[in-house]
Amino acid sequence: MPTIQQLIRTERSRLKAKTKSPALKSCPERRGVCTRVYTSTPKKPNSALRKVARVRLTSGFEVTAYIGGVGHNLQEHSVVLIRGGRVKDLPGVRYHIIRGTLDTAGVKDRRQSRSKYGAKTPKE
């Protein structure tokens, strides 16, 4: 424990908050190119085949990103936009691919939460 004199001499250093999405480099989104599109299995209590893609970003990072929604049109060399946000049951997946932008199509026949999946207003 420091003395008051030691604290006067040198102030306590603040702890720097570590970012949860370092590959974005303080940007809201980043563009990248898919290098591999595949499925992955989640952690213990859950069971599924989650769609993920390995993406090389313009910031120089290569990250694993989750493809949300039902069905997708992504393949190798597709250009995608990535946002932060992890997938709790997939270790190492800290990013999401934004649907409805660049080469990523929106989800078909989506009626609720359309803005999250890049779906246009359905025709009546």
From Swiss-Prot:
Statement: the UniProt record of this protein carries the keyword Methyltransferase: no
Gene3D superfamilies per the UniProt record, alphabetical: Nucleic acid-binding proteins
Segments of this protein annotated with the region Disordered: 104-124
Keywords tagged on the record: Methylation, Ribonucleoprotein, Ribosomal protein, RNA-binding, rRNA-binding, tRNA-binding
GO molecular function annotation: rRNA binding; structural constituent of ribosome; tRNA binding
InterPro entries per record: NA-bd_OB-fold (IPR012340), Ribosomal_uS12 (IPR006032), Ribosomal_uS12_bac (IPR005679)
Family as reported in the entry's similarity comment: Belongs to the universal ribosomal protein uS12 family.
Assembly: Part of the 30S ribosomal subunit. Contacts proteins S8 and S17. May interact with IF1 in the 30S initiation complex.
Protein name from the UniProt record: Small ribosomal subunit protein uS12
